[in-house]
Amino acid sequence: MAGGYGVMADDGTIDYSVHEAWNEATNVYLIVILVSIGLFMYARKNKRKIMRIFTVPPTAESATEANFYDDMKKIRLRQQLEMYYIARKHEQNDSIQLTVE
C-alpha cells in the first residue's frame, strides 16, 4: 500500500496531512455552525430591527394615491347616502298622500 491515498509514505511512516486537513475542515464547519446559530438567535431577538432595514418607506406617490382612493370612496358613499335620503323622502311623500286620500 505504498503511496496509496496519501496515508503511507514511501519510507513506511504515516502521512498525517489528510488528518490535519480533516481537522481543519471540521474546525471550519464548527465555526460556521456556531456563528450561524448565534446569528439565528440574534435575529429572533431583534426581528423588528432587521425587518425595518429591509422595508422600503412609502413614497409620496403611493400616499397621494391612497388619499385619492379614500376621497373617491367617501364621495361615492356620500352620493349613495344622498340617493337613499331622496328615495326615503319620496316614499314618505307617497305614504302621506295615500293616508290623506
UniProtKB/Swiss-Prot annotation:
Coiled coil: none
Membrane-protein topology: Single-pass membrane protein
Subcellular location: Membrane
Keywords: Membrane, Transmembrane, Transmembrane helix
GO cellular component terms, semicolon-separated: membrane
Transmembrane segments: 25-43
Presence of keyword Transmembrane: yes
InterPro entries: SMIM19 (IPR029368)
Family of the protein in this entry: Belongs to the SMIM19 family.
PANTHER family, A to Z: SMALL INTEGRAL MEMBRANE PROTEIN 19
Name of this chain's protein: Small integral membrane protein 19
Record organism: Xenopus tropicalis
Phylogenetic classification of the source organism: Eukaryota, Metazoa, Chordata, Craniata, Vertebrata
